[in-house]
């Protein structure tokens, strides 16, 4: 899956993955993390998510990472924010108060970029990636983040033979393989959401489960 794929999705406004509201799982489960009041939160593949604003509104320092320049500029425009724009290595960084969005390739991040990140929020990053890239993504997080980091991870699970991704199916077993050696994993919530997902029903999917994990890096 090349960067061009996502850039074209944004250019065509094919962004069904975008939620027009703060994610309910974030509202329900962020309090399960034991974080400093001003913790820095990494939000990979953030798009123009309203979750960024919610996190910043709670005094957290937010570091979104997004490939699409259009997504980043749309986010700041829609939130009526005028960012300060700088270059940091391979990234263009848009900053407004507690909020930073790094525009560029997530895989170009180095350990120094994430040195003060003590929290992770992944609502739509892992499930946006095909299998090989999921392994690379997890390994990147496992390598760059530090012990004690805590996070929320949201996944979808369905029969991948019934529908092509994205979003891709990620099983509980795969989460354990990707993160189990480095993180303590706890399922906070699991729901059957097929009845709420007409597009999946239309495509012939017969099972659709959403899970929310609490992760603590060891």
Swiss-Prot record:
Gene Ontology molecular function: any one: thiopurine S-methyltransferase activity
Gene3D superfamilies found in the cross-reference section: Vaccinia Virus protein VP39
Location in or out of the cell: Cytoplasm
EC number in record: 2.1.1.67
Reaction catalysed by this enzyme: S-adenosyl-L-methionine + a thiopurine = S-adenosyl-L-homocysteine + a thiopurine S-methylether
PROSITE patterns xrefs: SAM_MT_TPMT
Coiled coil: none
Alphabetized Pfam families for the sequence: TPMT
Enzyme class, broadest EC rank: transferase
Record protein name field: Thiopurine S-methyltransferase
């Amino acid at each position: 899956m090349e960067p061009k794929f996502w850039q074209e999705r944004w250019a065509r406004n094919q962004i069904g993955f975008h939620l027009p509201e703060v994610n309910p799982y974030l509202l329900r489960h962020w309090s399960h993390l034991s974080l400093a009041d001003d913790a820095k939160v990494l939000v990979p593949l953030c798009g123009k998510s309203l979750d960024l604003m919610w996190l910043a509104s709670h005094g957290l320092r937010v570091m979104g990472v997004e490939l699409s320049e259009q997504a980043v500029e749309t986010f700041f425009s829609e939130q009526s924010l005028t960012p300060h724009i700088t270059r940091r290595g391979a990234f263009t960084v848009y900053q407004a108060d507690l909020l930073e969005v790094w525009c560029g390739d997530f895989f170009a991040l180095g350990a120094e970029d994430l040195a003060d990140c003590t929290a992770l929020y992944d609502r739509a990053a892992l499930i946006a990636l095909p299998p090989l890239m999921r392994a690379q993504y997890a390994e990147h997080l496992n390598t760059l983040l530090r012990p004690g980091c805590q996070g929320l991870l949201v996944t979808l699970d369905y029969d991948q033979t019934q529908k092509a991704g994205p979003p891709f199916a990620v099983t509980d077993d795969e989460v354990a393989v990707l993160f189990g050696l480095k993180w303590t994993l706890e399922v906070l919530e699991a729901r059957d959401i097929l009845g709420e997902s007409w597009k999946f029903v239309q495509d012939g999917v017969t099972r659709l489960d959403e899970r929310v994990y609490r992760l603590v890096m060891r």
